[in-house]
Design a protein with these regions (language model features):
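Non-catalytic N-terminal targeting/anchoring module and adjacent flexible stem/linker
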Residues: 1, 108, 202-204
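Flexible, glycine/small-residue-enriched loop-and-beta-strand segment within the central core
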Residues: 3-105
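Conserved catalytic-core motifs of eukaryotic protein kinase domains, centered on the activation segment
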Residues: 46, 123, 139-140
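C-terminal segments of enzyme domains that contribute to small-molecule binding surfaces
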Residues: 57-101, 133-204
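A generic "structured core" feature
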Residues: 94, 108, 112-114, 118
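HATPase_c (GHKL) ATP-binding subdomain of two-component histidine kinases
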Residues: 95, 121, 130
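Conserved catalytic segment of ABC-fold P-loop ATPases
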Residues: 108-109, 124-126
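Acidic, glycine-centered active-site loop in nucleotide-sugar glycosyltransferases
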Residues: 125, 130-133
Length: 204
């Protein structure tokens, strides 16, 4: 989307006003208004744990070719999916330095991941997690406020139309004002433009 920054050396799906400063491998979905620090990484490929070996010899086609060329024998392979899906990062997510994310997990809206954490499971919305493996330390707000924020989805609006920023640390004021603005029709969702950079560069 417009007003976003693309991760270093990679094309990804990045929402408006998100600023990843790290190098992600492969396409990854990042929501709006995210702050992602340097050296955040995604775990490498999987290996089978329930086979006699974790080695790639049981599923990598090169080992069948090698067996035929060197030993004049065939080597039966059993399929194994080594690369999981990339993580999905929600909106208003803050990820600290040197965090490692497991593939296929979902980071909920408003979540915070402390620096040096290793995240192996989904992170609920507005949870603050830390550690190896990462565990929930606390939530940013109480459950009622979280439910309201997830319903309001403030990141879908132009930030300059949001309630008085001088009171941005009063979450109850923010929720009440957003509900008032929405119910009165005084705030409209922002239609951010989307760009496909691979198509743009291909057409140059």
């Amino acid at each position: 989307e417009e007003y976003s920054t693309m991760p270093v050396k990679n094309f990804s799906s990045v929402g408006a006003f998100s600023f990843p400063t790290c190098h992600f491998t492969g396409n990854i979905h990042i929501g709006r208004f995210c702050s992602i620090a340097s050296n955040v990484k995604i775990m490498g490929g999987n290996h089978p744990l329930n086979r006699f070996t974790t080695h790639m010899m049981t599923y990598n086609g090169e080992f069948d070719k090698f067996a035929k060329s060197e030993f004049e024998r065939s080597w039966t392979l059993k399929p194994f999916i080594t690369k999981p899906e990339n993580p999905i990062i929600g909106n208003d997510v803050w990820i600290g330095n040197d965090v490692v994310l497991k593939g296929g997990i979902a980071i909920g809206d408003g979540a915070v991941i402390a620096a040096n954490s290793v995240v192996t499971k989904d992170v609920p919305p507005y949870a603050i997690v830390a550690g190896v493996p990462a565990k929930i330390i606390r939530f940013r707000f109480d459950s009622n406020v979280i439910d309201e924020l997830l319903r309001i989805k403030w990141w879908n609006y132009n930030y300059s139309d949001l309630p008085d920023n001088n009171k941005c640390d009063d979450i109850n004021y923010f929720v009440e004002e957003m509900n008032r603005l929405i119910s009165n029709g005084n705030i409209q969702e922002m239609d951010y433009k989307k760009f496909n950079l691979s198509e743009i560069f291909r057409d140059l």
